C-alpha cells in the first residue's frame, strides 16, 4: 500500500485547488482510509480475480483518500464557514451533478468527479455516488440550519438526518465504484438497505458521543447529546445514547448473521462498527477529545 506521507502529499496536491482545504483534511482522510482498506485488504485480494482491481493500485487508493478528504472539507465548509454560502451552493451543485463548478477556486471538484467517472467499475455506482453526495450535502445543510433554529428537531428527526450526514453510504459507494463491490445490486436487497441504515445510525451516535465535549466547548449544537440535554436537562443522556448504540449494534449483528453478503462487506461493516475505538480515539487532530474546534460532523 502507498506510504502514508506520499499519500498525504498526493491528496494535498489535489486539495490545493479547493478554497479552504487544510492539511488536516488530507491527513485524516488518509488515516481513515488506511484503517478501512487495511481491514478489508484480504477480502479485496479475493475479489480481484473477478474484478481485475488490484487492492494495491495506487491510483484507486489515492482517489479513495481524496473522496474522503472531500467529505471532511464539505463538512467544515458548512460548520466552519470556510467558503461563502454562494460558493457552497455552487460546489454542492457541481459535486452532485458531476459537472465543473460555476465559480472559480474549486477546480478539484471536477477533477475528482472526472476521475471517479473514468475509474468506475460499474457506472451505476457513479450515478449513486452523485445521489449520495446530494443527500450528504442536504443533510449537512439541514443539520447546520437546525442547530441555530428556534424550533429544534426531535431526537428521531435528528437521527434520521444524521444517517445521511455521517456519509457512510458515500464511503461504501466509493469503495464499490473503485473495487467492484457490486453495491448497486446489493442495494436492491431490503436487508442490505437495513444494514446501511443501522451502521450509519451507529456511526452517527459514535461520532456524537465521542465529540460531545468538544462540540459543546466550540458552541456546536448539532449533536445528539447536546440536543437531548437542551430538551431534557435532567435526562441521563449519555447512558441513554449508549443504550441506543448498543441496541442498534445488536440489530445490525442479527441482520448480518441472517444474511450472507459477499466479501468484503462483512469485514467492512465490522470495521465501521469499531471506528470509535480504532479511529476516533486514536486521532491526533480532528477527533482529539482535548482539542477545541467546531465541525465534528464529518464521516469516518
Swiss-Prot record:
InterPro entries: Isoprenoid_synthase_dom_sf
Gene3D superfamilies hit by this protein: Farnesyl Diphosphate Synthase (1.10.600.10)
Superkingdom, natural source: Bacteria
Pfam families given in the database record: Terpene_syn_C_2
Protein name: Uncharacterized protein blr2150
Organism of derivation: Bradyrhizobium diazoefficiens (strain JCM 10833 / BCRC 13528 / IAM 13628 / NBRC 14792 / USDA 110)
